[in-house]
Amino acid sequence: MSVKPIFGNLIVWKSIYEHRARYYVDAIRVIDTSSIFEGDSIAKLEINRDLPWLNKMSQQADDIERFRWFSADHLALDPNDPYRIIDIRYSMLPNKLDGLWGIKLSPYAHSAQHITWTANRSVNERAENLKKLWLMIKGSGARPAP
């Protein structure tokens, strides 16, 4: 389990834990009385299950392992894109799993082709996410911590 402050504030922290090959995230408001914003869960990346088409001797496979190292093995498939792997530690909202960055694979890539690095910073969602984060900072909608 890890708990750390999120970008830009020290009031709402992100908790991440793994149980039975799934990651779980919650937001924890740490000021005054601690409170929790329940979050999402996602299956931990398993190459054989999630990417059965991947050539294990390819550059893409090497790139995944490099990304795994840099993300401390906090990887999952993007639920909206079966060819994108995300680092679940960082998201716009601390109780969400919409990775700020990731890598994009192609099942049609030749064996020497690299992955593509991607960022998830939608301008359309930014204002809505900032409103939600502000409500979290104020403690609106949280449940008391046990």
Task: For the regions a language model picked out, list residue spans one by one.
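Extracytosolic and intramembrane catalytic regions of membrane-associated proteins
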Residues: 7-146
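Acidic carboxylate-rich catalytic motifs and surrounding loops in phosphoryl-/glycosyl-chemistry enzymes
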Residues: 4
